[in-house]
Amino acid sequence: MAEQLPEPVLLSELLHMDKVTIAGQLVEFRHVFYTWIAMLILFIVGLIVRRKLTLVPGRLQNFFEVLISSFENFTVINIGEEGRKFFPVLIGIFLLIAVENLLGLIPLCDAPTANINTNIGMAIFVFLYYNYEGIKKWGFHYIHHFMGPSIVLAPFMIILECISHLARPLSLTLRLFGNIKGEEIVLLLFFLMAPLVGTIPVYFLFLLAKLLQAFIFYILTLIYLKGALESAH
């Protein structure tokens, strides 16, 4: 069955960007190429929205104002007013992952989040980011987040908390990779069984699912950041 699945024609193949030679080694580059495309899309959309800012917003400006303000309010509700300074990073993570996920539904494109290396990179960034902000706020006292409520249990809690925190990047990586890769395989199978009727409803279902996965990544990042910023008693 796997040998009969057709290979889609991708833009990266046409431009010979699937693999590149770096330091004499041939390395996989497809996911990096489509990540660049996702960033380029966000940059262009940002420029368009910025140039068309008016006191009476049009449809595009109104859409982004509602989207951004909703996410900002959600962040402030969960973290407090302090969350406003972290909001640009959080919304940036959501928008980048959302566009990367949706690229998998566009002809000639592939979702970079269907490659585990992309997700590892973003998960490590989240891990380093929330721990950095926690250490920045609490200094040496940040270790209290790992010690638990009792000094007697502290040695055991530190071990458990370290394992828990180290598992977070793995969880973020596998959750996003598994869902996006699985959706692409299922969509291809539906297309083979029913090229038109069976694909259109599933296509829009997966569109929502890909946005949901970006939102889940944003929510988990928010939760980890909130935990790092809260006072440890």
UniProtKB/Swiss-Prot annotation:
Record flagged with keyword Ribonucleoprotein: no
Cellular component GO terms, alphabetical: plasma membrane; proton-transporting ATP synthase complex
Subcellular location: Cell membrane
TM regions (residue ranges): 29-49, 86-106, 108-128, 140-160, 185-205, 206-226
Keywords associated with the record: ATP synthesis, Cell membrane, CF(0), Hydrogen ion transport, Ion transport, Membrane, Transmembrane, Transmembrane helix, Transport
GO molecular function: proton-transporting ATP synthase activity, rotational mechanism
GO BP of this protein: proton motive force-driven plasma membrane ATP synthesis
Keyword match Ion transport: yes
UniProt membrane topology term: Multi-pass membrane protein
InterPro entries reported in the protein's UniProt record: ATP_syn_F0_a_bact/chloroplast, ATP_synth_F0_asu, ATP_synth_F0_asu_AS, F0_ATP_A_sf
Organism superkingdom: Bacteria
Reported function: Key component of the proton channel; it plays a direct role in the translocation of protons across the membrane.
Binding partners and assembly: F-type ATPases have 2 components, CF(1) - the catalytic core - and CF(0) - the membrane proton channel. CF(1) has five subunits: alpha(3), beta(3), gamma(1), delta(1), epsilon(1). CF(0) has three main subunits: a(1), b(2) and c(9-12). The alpha and beta chains form an alternating ring which encloses part of the gamma chain. CF(1) is attached to CF(0) by a central stalk formed by the gamma and epsilon chains, while a peripheral stalk is formed by the delta and b chains.
HAMAP family noted in UniProt: ATP_synth_a_bact
Family: Belongs to the ATPase A chain family.
Stored PANTHER family: ATP SYNTHASE SUBUNIT A, CHLOROPLASTIC
Name of this chain's protein: ATP synthase subunit a
Taxonomic lineage: Bacteria, Pseudomonadati, Thermodesulfobacteriota, Desulfovibrionia, Desulfovibrionales
